[in-house]
Amino acid sequence: MDDPSATLLPEHSEDLRLARDAELKKVLKLKLVLDELRRLDVGPNPSDEIKRALKLVSIGSYARLGEMEGAGQEQVLGLPSGSSFPPLNYTDRKTVRTKLSAQLRTTLQPIAELCDRIREEFPDAFGQEADLSCDQKEILRLEEEHRSGLEKLVALLTRKCTLLKETAELKLGPQLANELKLQQAQAQLVQTKAELLRGFFVHEAASRTEHSVKAHKEVEAHLDELLAAKK
């Protein structure tokens, strides 16, 4: 059976490809924005964090939006075909960076300003306990216990390391002094043995040499007597 896709006209296939590429560009741009939004840490001072995000979007790796840098490139939203989007030219990349920066600034700055204003006007609003269910309260309680247990464990491990260090210093201090004295005593003992052996060998060599000369003379005299008797 013939492939139904083979009946499509070439211009129709080109239009479909261009439409697919355009949609993939939109998906990729949205994914980049969402990834950067997820990295935001809206803490006590979110303005600095938002400025950091805007800076990353402006001069970060998004400048190469659409470029292929290897087979291990992340797929767009898990779509295998998401990595086949066409590369963007310089104008497109600049437009994307400008629009991303403008959209982030327009969307996030009012949120940050509102958050700062709420914190100033209602400083105790965020400290009040939320209306949580029993299960949620239990989860929070267990999380607090877990965090408290970890803090206690860290404190105990730190205390243990300190005690081990102090014990090692107390133990090794006198021990090293005693070992040094022992090494000195052993060295003196070896030196004394060497001196005794040297004196013994000198004495033995001198005494044995004297006896050897005397015995040699006696044997020589005895041989002379035997030779004279044979004549």
From Swiss-Prot:
Which regions form coiled coils? Answer: 128-199
The alphabetized UniProt keywords are: Cell cycle, Cell division, Coiled coil, Cytoplasm, Cytoskeleton, Microtubule, Mitosis
Quote the tissue specificity entry.
In adult females, detected only in the abdomen with no expression in the head or thorax (at protein level).
| Broad class of the protein's primary localization | cytoplasm
In which compartments does the protein localize?
Answer: Cytoplasm, Cytoskeleton, Spindle; Cytoplasm, Cytoskeleton, Spindle pole
Q: Does the keyword Cell division apply?
A: yes
Q: Name one GO cellular component term.
A: cytoplasm
Transmembrane stretches, start-end:
none
Q: Name one GO biological process term.
A: cell division
Keyword Cell cycle on this protein?
Answer: yes
Q: Which GO terms describe its molecular function?
A: microtubule binding
Any idea what job this protein has?
A: As part of the augmin complex, plays a role in centrosome-independent generation of spindle microtubules. The complex is required for mitotic spindle assembly through its involvement in localizing gamma-tubulin to spindle microtubules. dgt2 binds to microtubules in vitro.
The miscellaneous remark of the record is: The name 'dim gamma-tubulin 2' derives from the decreased gamma-tubulin staining of the spindle pole seen following RNAi-mediated knockdown of dgt2 in S2 cells.
Oligomer status and interactors: Component of the augmin complex composed of dgt2, dgt3, dgt4, dgt5, dgt6, msd1, msd5 and wac. The complex interacts directly or indirectly with microtubules and is required for centrosome-independent generation of spindle microtubules. dgt2 interacts directly with wac (via coiled coil).
Q: What is this protein called?
A: Augmin complex subunit dgt2
Identify the species of origin: Drosophila melanogaster
